[in-house]
Amino acid sequence: MSNLPFTVAALYCFAPLPQYESLREPLAQLCCANGIKGTLLLAAEGINGTVAGSAGAIEKLIAHITAIPGLGEPELKYSHASEMPFHRMKVRLKREIVTMGVEGIDPLKSVGTYIAPKDWNALIADENTVVVDTRNDYEYAIGTFEGAIDPQTRTFREFPEWVKQNRDRLEGKKIAMFCTGGIRCEKATAFVKGLGFDDVYHLKGGILKYLEEVPREQSMWNGECFVFDERVAVGHGLAESDVELCRACRRPLTPQDKLSQFFEEGVSCAGCYAERTPEDRARYAERQKQVKLAEKRGANKHIGS
């Protein structure tokens, strides 16, 4: 049991939800009434999201979601935060609950073999296994598993094309995939199996479940795991990390990254300095000035974030 005041729940479930639009308002009302913040995505293929609130509030929400007809038990990962990691509550209607952009991908029909965290090390240590990080390049940059391939994608939509262009690296191998919480791998493994590969595996519960269950001394994870909230990243035991966001480009920054000559809080980092014009940086600098003034007044921290 954590002493931190906020419970963070990352959840998803693939299930046919033909009337998903009607679920939006009841979910939004329940979350607002119980002080829950975060994002929930609803689509005809299921539900996905990460939310935070008191333990009791999150328990109510999960009970509500589990009771939705046809949905069943969602895949759930819990962690904790010292401060509310979200600024508002959003319940959105989408075409996909995780956007791959490939028609006909259905994890309910075909998906890779799930590997429990306790068995993951043995799989990725096998010399006949190719380990693929299905996340984006900025996530890979701050942490990944030993020997994992970085597809260097900026969005998950780019992943299918990477697979097609790198078939030769996967042929004749066991293909082990992983992502933050497991949902991207549901579609990634379904896509790869659809191309004719048979030995396709993915980490059940994702990196978050691995970091929760596998002791640091046995871990093959290096670095931090990026999360899409104000904690920015978590480490072993799902402890909060010292990684921060560049408020200009939203890239994660380690303490070492902040030593770069191109880093200026709220204005630029080494990753985005060359991508921005002097006018952009001047605008960001003014915004950062307003953020600091607002903080002094005790206003909301998320101005400009």
From Swiss-Prot:
Any GO molecular function:
oxidoreductase activity, acting on paired donors, with incorporation or reduction of molecular oxygen
Residue span, Rhodanese domain: 125-219
Enzyme class of the recorded protein, top EC level: oxidoreductase
Name a biological process GO annotation: tRNA modification
The positions flagged as active site in the entry are C179 (cysteine persulfide intermediate)
Q: Which InterPro entries match?
A: Rhodanese-like_dom (IPR001763), Rhodanese-like_dom_sf (IPR036873), TrhO (IPR020936), TRHO_N (IPR040503)
Enzyme Commission code(s) on record: 1.14.-.-
Q: Which UniProt keywords apply?
A: Oxidoreductase, tRNA processing
Member of which family?
Belongs to the TrhO family.
Matches recorded under NCBIfam families: PRK00142.1-4
Query: Sorted alphabetically, which PANTHER family does this protein's record hold?
Result: RHODANESE-LIKE DOMAIN-CONTAINING PROTEIN 7-RELATED (PTHR43268:SF3), THIOSULFATE SULFURTRANSFERASE/RHODANESE-LIKE DOMAIN-CONTAINING PROTEIN 2 (PTHR43268)
- Protein name per its UniProtKB record: tRNA uridine(34) hydroxylase
What is the native source organism of this protein?
Answer: Brucella ovis (strain ATCC 25840 / 63/290 / NCTC 10512)
**What does UniProt list as this organism's lineage?**
Bacteria, Pseudomonadati, Pseudomonadota, Alphaproteobacteria, Hyphomicrobiales
| Gene name of this polypeptide | trhO
